[in-house]
Curated annotation (Swiss-Prot):
Protein name stated in the entry: Leucine carboxyl methyltransferase 1
Principal EC category: transferase
One MF annotation (Gene Ontology) recorded for this entry: protein C-terminal leucine carboxyl O-methyltransferase activity
PANTHER family per UniProt: LEUCINE CARBOXYL METHYLTRANSFERASE, LEUCINE CARBOXYL METHYLTRANSFERASE 1
Compositional bias (Basic residues): 17-27
Amino acid sequence: MSGPEIPNLLSSLRSARGGRGRGRGRGGHASSSATHDSTIQGTDTDASVSRLSAVDLGYLDDPYAQYFVRSSAGPAARRLPIINRGTYARTISLDTLIESFLSADQSTGPDSTPKQIVSLGAGTDTRPFRLFASKARPGLVYHELDFEVVTSKKLRTVQAVPLLRNILTNVTQLTEHSWSSKPSGGEYYCHGQDLRNFSLSKASKEYHNTQDAPQEKPEITLPGLRTDIPTLLLSECCLCYLNGTEASDVLNFFTSRIPNLATIIYEPIRPDDAFGKMMVSNLAARRIEMPTLKMYPTPEDQRTRLRTAGFETVHHMTIEDIWQNWVSPEEKQRVDYLEGLDEVEEWKLLAAHYIVVWASRGSGFGNWGGVGVGA
């Protein structure tokens, strides 16, 4: 399904003290569907505030974050140092992989290879603004999927803010649930699509003309989706909130259509040790489940998951690994100088309970799969 931000394990540990991080909500039916969806959608504000906190303190450079935080609530909250560092580490890890994907096997000029990114449960993510504004992106096709209420709100924000409107120009309403733009020679699409519908649509076909057939669902259509170019499927704390079948059906939708496909999955892991149990308990107190966390609790489980889905080359690193290996000593010093971090051991525990798994199959990815490996 799609949806805005859901509190991740980093944030839930500190929710009692006001610290929340960014996650991608979308599933699990711990309560009634409407109530659960509302809970997920409400956490988008927490995530955008966490992002803005990291920006305001100098961790990240993101001039667009401010426009997705309600100013009527007063000054944006300042998150705890450990939350700000988590937001920073997660962002730079994904940015590094995405930029590497975009530059892999890439020439300059009119012969450059088109690339496509599909972001699941994008919420208030500012990445498309940052990508299209940083330099010309001819041939980049960028899709975001989320609950319709979220994508509609994003459209209103774009239309209301000149800086955003100047990036996502020529906005067009394609269908009742999808809108698009033509930024910097590229293409942007935003789809109001509950990711759980991928399973419902599949079930409609499988049980067609039987007494057990579920209520008929329309065919899943994503206007502008290309199947002929290298594509990156991004799940930033998204699929972990779907049940196992739903998550697999989302992956299958894309693997069955796009031969040259890569994915990045950012999710929590290790729910069975003492620290993991505490984090899961804190999430459960907020009536939030992470079904795939139970199904893929270890790094190897996550790797096997993607191999089973059809990906040929699979890599992983924990956030702790990425902090140690991808962040230069000079950058670590800069980040430390911003606030300092007293809870070093707690940070290591938190960072060890998040993983980034990236995988690819087919052509058009160059050495993308080996980014940072062995660094």
